[in-house]
Design a protein with these regions (language model features):
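Short, basic/low-complexity N-terminal boundary segments at the transition from targeting/disordered tails
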Residues: 2-25, 129-136
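Acidic/histidine-rich helix-loop elements
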Residues: 17-22, 57-61, 119-129, 199-208
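Divalent metal-coordination and catalytic microenvironments
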Residues: 32, 46, 56, 66, ...
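Metallo-beta-lactamase
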Residues: 52, 59-61, 141-148, 153-158, ...
């Protein structure tokens, strides 16, 4: 376990210094739906006349990057009224407290993720060596104030914005995917933001494989014209963004139901093989 922990810490520190912390150009995906994350750690802004929703918090040190991206698009972080989260690991929950202080937004969390977010990343399902690193502050992050806890199937609203929560456990117990409509011109597009479907096997979460299988089934049942995930490389952020800069309609490269099905097929094949990532 100590070897695994060291490998994971190395990956985390590498992501912190390189992959997860490089700012990238923010852009509109479709309608009122924007990408404001880094080159790989994703964050999304959904804008509305009564306030905005920000999905995911990144690492503690990416929060300022997210806010800079929001400003570059012409919006104000102080107009973010709701913060949402996919899962409480440091690369997605670590910056929520910083964003919360900057915006004054209310944080909604799944019942199974709330305590971890409020504790700065502690989770009884994390293997003990990694929990020790969280307790020591090496892998921990500033605790977030959880204002509301939601259940599977709840809908979070800010004016005309409505996002439905789908608790898709496996990566963590409270891992949450989101579905919501986006109006782009005369098209009403279905968007799915899928939570991580990979697992880090742990003896304290014996339902992990069953939850992962259920999550894939749930996600297959969600119509997705546009799909994204909490890591940009999985849904082809860069490729789709580049294609959008020359497309007749810049939204078209992001419409990818075939890619969504392929992503779920790959996750199911990984599950059947017993592999994790």
């Amino acid at each position: 376990l100590s070897v695994v922990a060291l490998v994971l810490v190395g990956r985390w520190l590498n992501a912190t210094k390189v992959g997860g912390q490089q700012p990238t150009e923010p852009f509109r995906i479709a309608g009122n739906f924007y990408y404001v994350g880094t080159n790989d750690v994703a964050a999304f802004l959904i804008t509305g006349p009564e306030g905005h929703v920000l999905l995911d918090g990144g690492y503690p040190s990416t929060a300022l990057m997210f806010m800079a991206s929001i400003a570059k698009l012409g919006f104000d972080t102080k107009d973010v009224k709701v913060l949402l989260n996919s899962e409480p690991h440091p690369d997605h929950g670590g910056g929520l407290a910083v964003l919360q202080r900057a915006s004054g937004a209310q944080l909604w969390a799944s019942e199974a993720s709330a305590d971890s977010l409020a504790s700065g990343g502690d989770d009884p399902d994390i293997i003990l060596p990694l929990r020790g690193l969280i307790w020591s502050g090496i892998l921990g992050y500033p605790p977030a104030r959880v204002d509301h806890r939601f259940k599977d199937g709840d809908t979070i609203r800010v004016g005309p914005i409505a996002l439905t929560a789908h608790v898709t456990g496996g990566h963590t117990r409270g891992c949450t995917s989101w579905s919501f409509p986006v109006r782009d011109g005369d098209r009403l597009l279905n968007v799915v933001s899928a939570c991580d479907l990979g697992v880090l096997a742990t003896s304290t979460y014996p339902e992990q494989a069953a939850d992962r299988e259920r999550s894939i089934r749930v996600l297959r049942g969600l119509p997705a014209d546009i799909w994204v995930t909490c890591h940009a490389r999985w849904w082809g952020r860069y490729r789709k963004f580049v294609a959008s800069t020359t497309a007749k309609n810049p939204v078209d490269p992001f419409i990818d139901p075939e890619g969504y099905r392929a992503y779920l097929d790959a996750a199911e094949a990984e599950l059947r093989s017993g592999r994790t990532h």
